[in-house]
Amino acid sequence: MKFIVNSTALLRELQKLNGVISSSNTLPILDNFLFNINNNQMSIVASDLETTMMSSISVEADADGKITIPARILIDTLKTFSNQPLTFIVDTNTFGIEMSSELGNYKLAGQNADEFPKIPTLQSSSSTTMKGEVLVNAINKTLFASGNDELRPVMSGVFCELSSEQTTFVATDAHKLVKHSRTDVKSDNTVSFILPKKPLTILKNNIGDDSDVTLEYNETNALFSFGNITIICRLIDGKYPNYEAVIPKENPNKLTIATSTLLSSIKRVSIYANKTTHQIRFKVAGSELQITSEDLDFANKAEERLSCQYEGEDMEIGFNSKFVIDMLNNIGAEQISIEMSAPNRAGIILPLDGMEEGENTLMLVMPVMLINYYEKNNLNFSPYILHNCKYSTKFNSY
């Protein structure tokens, strides 16, 4: 089998797919790309068994056929070429591959394509369509808040809930939570599932803003298709926590401030915070927000005062600065509102601008303990959203 392909075009497609290939594959053949030629169109497949990604490219071929080629050596070679045609000759008996360029020849060992895992197919699936920029925005708003705890796999992805009224994306790691919804993306069926982190990362890196994305799903898999790309992923099995139960409904204390002003201040003050807790303290009184941090081990301390708009009683509350910085970096608004009720209850961050019609984002961050408040009020404290361990769906009352 012989085929000719443009080096730049091939490299562009392989780099898209390379993110799927795992550094610790259980099957050696998964270190390869699957090339399948049919009528001068070559489909390229990469898989790690959980996520499968496919692309296609035009070639000049003397016959149909398929082969798997080692990913790393092929990409490393293609990176060194200028834009030129490359000729591949495949020995269908030994699976040896000879690649020819304008400057020379390169031999590498392929593997039998029949040994490559079968591409998953979706049976009894439903589908919906959304704009690429809508999906990318939803991923950017939520993915950072997902967890990495192997004991709670349902929290390591993004929960997606589709209905006839809206589509909602939710992510949490038990310390922070993000809920992002769109009323302009709907489904005929009411369904929910948990999308893994890896395919979502690949999606946001490859979807163009002007692309239309088709999402197909059933009980075990989800399929995303756009342009010449198809991504199939296995859904995370399990029941997602009742996230609505942890969102405080009564938040009488409301602070309004410019996102960039608050973000810059927190970044500076957090440098002086304890390196384990990353604790910063908000003290709000009148139209002034005081942000402080302290590291007693090294006698470090910082304080800044910012002007803000505030409605409510004077209060103090502690937060993990890393969580707040993550949220402000991803909220996509110039002005935000922080809604609070008490030092031992979650704070809510809401964007006040930058939202499209039908788009809503809510970010929740759990407080960290302020010793003086809890000693004075004789209160217990937990910085976790979840009440208990492995697959619990119960939230704390606060």
Task: Please state what every model-predicted region is.
Residues 1-389, 394:
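Structural preference for solvent-exposed beta-strand-turn elements
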